[in-house]
Amino acid sequence: MQVLPPGSTGGPSRLFILRPVATTLLMAAILLAGIIGYRFLPVAALPEVDYPTIQVVTLYPGASPDVMTSAVTAPLERQFGQMSGLKQMSSQSSGGASVVTLQFQLTLPLDVAEQEVQAAINAATNLLPSDLPNPPIYSKVNPADPPIMTLAVTSNAMPMTQVEDMVETRVAQKISQVSGVGLVTLAGGQRPAVRVKLNAQAVAALGLTSETVRTAITGANVNSAKGSLDGPERAVTLSANDQMQSADEYRRLIIAYQNGAPVRLGDVATVEQGAENSWLGAWANQAPAIVMNVQRQPGANIIATADSIRQMLPQLTESLPKSVKVTVLSDRTTNIRASVRDTQFELMLAIALVVMIIYLFLRNIPATIIPGVAVPLSLIGTFAVMVFLDFSINNLTLMALTIATGFVVDDAIVVIENISRYIEKGEKPLAAALKGAGEIGFTIISLTFSLIAVLIPLLFMGDIVGRLFREFAVTLAVAILISAVVSLTLTPMMCARMLSQQSLRKQNRFSRACERMFDRVIASYGRGLAKVLNHPWLTLSVAFATLLLSVMLWIVIPKGFFPVQDNGIIQGTLQAPQSSSYASMAQRQRQVAERILQDPAVQSLTTFVGVDGANSTLNSTRLQINLKPLDARDDRVQQVISRLQTAVATIPGVALYLQPTQDLTIDTQVSRTQYQFSLQATTLDALSHWVPKLQNALQSLPQLSEVSSDWQDRGLAAWVNVDRDSASRLGISMADVDNALYNAFGQRLISTIYTQANQYRVVLEHNTASTPGLAALETIRLTSRDGGTVPLSAIARIEQRFAPLSINHLDQFPITTFSFNVPEGYSLDDAVQAILDTEKTLALPADITTQFQGSTLAFQAALGSTVWLIVAAVVAMYIVLGVLYESFIHPITILSTLPTAGVGALLALIIAGSELDIIAIIGIILLIGIVKKNAIMMIDFALAAEREQGMSPRDAIFQACLLRFRPILMTTLAALLGALPLMLSTGVGAELRRPLGIAMVGGLLVSQVLTLFTTPVIYLLFDRLSLYVKSRFPRHKEEA
């Protein structure tokens, strides 16, 4: 048994050093738990931080935006506004469609929100129009969230109406049942229907009206209960031929008698099988298609959901005819998986670089193996905790583990270096392990808890940004904590068994060359440090200048919210003049699609024209452009967008707005551009006065580009001004007028055909082919009191006016949203400030309010809390260090290193042309935890030298700096190399990772050079200050 020297108790590590088998088994258990946990971790792009969001869609074909607002949207809004936990309610009322989007507080479960929405819809039912074709339909989905998967269904042999019927009954329903799917929408609008196109002249010639025809059809097609007969022995169910299923049956329907002769529907109308809405269409790569957009529920796992759909697709497509082709046009999980793979590669590269730097410094294979074991053990063990906390493998958690690579190795390096130093002095390995581990134990605890303290403020960040980085902070904190445990248990135990004087002294030519190099570097550092200590005020001036420079750089650096990712999918809106018809929009989309598909980076394209729950107005076309994989194209997404907009710019009468899809979706409405600013008033008249003024002012700002608004009040409208007195004299009511107009021009759904698989509509309208435009109104006839027919022109005057194409509300009040992008050379912070200055210049009245929306609002909130976040991190670390050192002074000395990290990070971001965004700020906060390690290692040894060896403060700090120079350099380089793969990343999702790497590498480079000299000087300054205070207040000294 070895005789241990006095003081070599080993501290908390003693038990683990002396019991190697128990220590090994304990570490094996941590490793096994991590491996098992990894298999159960889901994969995602980012942590699940979606607001609980529900979309309520109500379709009322033929209704104007005014009618939709007053008759549908307003009653629903009044009921929704009473729900608890509602964060924001926005609505959009357009011709025939009302879409209300409800965003709830993050703390409210989605299922609870769903129950409240259903109850509110039920309460509003009696207030909605009685002839509403379908009740409001709600979906647990955020409309601004891009589809997780887009599929196109095409056929060269079958009409699109049959294709849609098959897709709706055989495919869409099954996909909707997949766990995690929130909504499956079919773009293209080709639901089968029987269309009845009345010949107005033929109807009038027979003395009939459209209302006569409608009544006849609705009475002839019914499907109601008829009862049953219950006899003494048998029961008989009653049924009848009350249903008409085909266009031929409707064509033969007798609608009236003239002079004893039957008038059949086919005599006055064209009856045919067609689509329910003839003003809807979708195309995939210019071919007519039914496009299925699959959106996930907020909070659902996107990878698991997409995998379930793909597993189901072969079975579903087998049930379709051979001529029907189903193509997956886009799958967001492809890029998510690629991004996660790239991040995993960078994690492995970081581990390899860190192990390499360890070997370079230690030049000993056994000594390199020890931290080489500690790093993967700490990282893998973290997976077990992540499973317990319901985390996922995503870009942020993998970034945390990549950064943790440099952190977790620090503890092991510090322990190994200290134990090796005693072995090289002649101590036995076991005694050296006990003594070295006991001596360094407090330093490891200080490093660990002070670093975790930096992360604590991240856990208390509010709103969606706080939720986003909670997984990052907790994952990193867990890895650091496990690393500390490993460094105080397994590392010293392995040192006691694997290190020896022979192994440490065994050197080859490379080792000796490295040793000579390190000796020269340390000697040079010692000479430089001696000069610096002799000129403290010059050094303090440099430290103070660094502080001022960090503040200046913070003010001038461009600031942003979240890096714009290249996910390979572009969402777009094609805008045309407000009076554009469906036919003209279909022609325009063909021209635009042709230009877009010619671009070498484009893989596929889907376009949609018409009004439904996804598209609000007829003069806009929705596009989704799917790009080739990143390694198969030369340009990033922003370059492709610029090229496409240039190509389309020469097409007259259209404006194309494009933006790349992002993994983080904060908006609740589909926007034309990345950022939004809203103008809200109590009335539409107030908005109409101020919107043009503000839009002109915003368009003149150089900090903004592609400025547009959703205010569209120049749509053509025909105002039917009825002479109520004349109408009353003829026995014609306003309801008669509305019904006649609705029958003629509203694609009115007048009856339902029920089948075993689905339900289909009978659509009534006038055949306006021979009388287009306003002339069609002259064909309208109404039934008077005496049974005769009266032309509409006899009781009404037709006026052409302008009317809004859509009416938007936010929390029940009218609102207009301005969309904008930020041009190259400016930051989002510049744009926000320019908008605020413009608002002040315009001097808006008190009843007009403005607000940033979506990601711009989140940016404002994040920017406002950033300074407080950093202050909170510093205060938290000061408190922890003060408790550990039982001193008010030493924590200040340690924290004095922070400005150097800030200067380095900000300079690196500016040089790299990167904005100070949320990711970069997280990097700066992490630097706070890393950089202070240097000071802790210096001060710990200086205090020990003063206390145990009686050295003067100057000699103690000088010796501590030289003794700890090598581990400081080693740990800093390890952290730097851990961040280097992130800084140099170029794969999918690199935009997200790069700012963190740039900030950390820049901060570490600058701080490493400066803190090695400024920390000793500041230590001595505060020591003299402490002596001065004690001399002026001797009572404190006596009490001490």
Curated annotation (Swiss-Prot):
Segments crossing the lipid bilayer: 25-45, 347-367, 369-389, 396-416, 440-460, 472-492, 537-557, 863-883, 888-908, 910-930, 968-988, 998-1018
Membrane topology qualifier: Multi-pass membrane protein
Alphabetical list of InterPro entries matching this protein: AcrB_DN_DC_subdom, Acrflvin-R, Multidrug-R_MdtB
Main localization (coarse): membrane
Location(s), subcellular: Cell inner membrane
Keyword entries, A-Z: Cell inner membrane, Cell membrane, Membrane, Transmembrane, Transmembrane helix, Transport
Cystine connections: none
Iron-sulfur found in the keyword field: no
Any one GO molecular-function label of the UniProt entry: xenobiotic transmembrane transporter activity
GO cellular component term, pick one: plasma membrane
One Pfam family recorded for the sequence: ACR_tran
NCBIfam families tied to this protein: PRK10503.1 (NF007798), RND_permease_2 (NF033617)
UniProt record similarity statement: Belongs to the resistance-nodulation-cell division (RND) (TC 2.A.6) family. MdtB subfamily.
Subunit structure: Part of a tripartite efflux system composed of MdtA, MdtB and MdtC. MdtB forms a heteromultimer with MdtC.
Identification of the protein by name: Multidrug resistance protein MdtB
